[in-house]
Amino acid sequence: FRKIEQRVWPPTTSFGAGWSTSSVSKIKLAKLGKPFQHKRKVVMSEKIKVGILGATGMVGQRFVTLLENHPWFELVTLAASAHSAGKTYEEAIGGRWKMETPMPEFVKNMVVKNVADVEDVVKNVDFVFSAVNMPKAKIRTIEEEYAKTETPVVSNNSAHRFTPDVPMVVPEINADHIDIIPAQRKRLGTKRGFV
């Protein structure tokens, strides 16, 4: 891992997309297998390496813009359908970039991986953001496949809305809903992975 300047975790600000520092801090702690609740600050010396599933769609593009120059996350992997796999991100998007800001330079030449090739996608990431656009049953299956590789999945999909052990978290309102994750891990047979 590449060292970066040390940052105090959690900082006192939020960073958009409905996430607050407290929720990210809890995800980081959950990822490391530590207790979910904490009272003291943790010093971060490395960025968290993340990937985006469904990176070529509208929500995936939004994740790309949110992660550009992010102080805590380093976007290292982009994944999309087999149609986009093997192309650079710029080629895969073509003229379909829908964000108000230009496509970030750092992603233009990243090669898009096939979202179905789970083992290849998770090789270099600490966790993934999921923005895949497919039938709900298939989303549930693929997100759980990623979790079973011990890769936490932060999903923007509603596919797990009625899955009893998958929390739907709005951090400022119900952050304690992540307390159900140990039950999900038991069902999936994982130590770190969850959706």
Model-derived segments and spans:
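N-terminal Rossmann-like NAD(P) cofactor-binding subdomain of oxidoreductases
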Residues: 39-195
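Generic N-terminal simple sequence motifs
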Residues: 6-7, 31, 100
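Short terminal hydrophobic/aromatic SLiMs and anchors at protein ends
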Residues: 12, 26-29, 38
